[in-house]
Amino acid sequence: MLNINIENEYSRLKTVILGIADNLGNPPSESDAFDPRSLYHIKNNSYPLEEDLKKEVESFKKKLTKHNVEVLRPNNVNDCNQIFARDLGFVVSNMFFLSNIVPNRQDEIEGIKEILNHLNVGVIKLPEFMHIEGGDIIVHNDKVFIGTYSEEDYPSLITARTNNESIDYLKRIITVSYTHLRAHET
């Protein structure tokens, strides 16, 4: 069983789930792009090649293991981009929260199920209407910073991935203080 406990983002890392770059499938079409940066690279024929991504991820793995970090890897899901494992869930204290990620990325969850089954705690699955991604969470001792988007057009934006309902839910479960981060208005 895996013991988990995250009190902040900068203490010594002991174990991490690192994404993989195997069997990504074809680059997405413009209409399937998840975010503006991917769309830019698709339009400019500069979308990363699988072989380059594999080298990058493996180089990162070597650095982690050199520093005695246990590296866990998702099981391969064919034709699925599994690079950004951080988005799939997050840990606060000794609780693992499984993200409700955008529908286009649901297959990625399959790749980490075996790892989740080996955790020494239950996995908390957020209710379906609550959206949150692990990359939007920063744990800082007795505080949790959550990046979110709360404008009325939230449902129409694929890049707005954490909503206010998820923040309210986390406030009820985790006994730490929260800081709601908003984009700077220019």
Show the residue positions of the predicted features.
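The feature marks the mature, well-folded catalytic cores of soluble enzymes
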Residues: 1-182
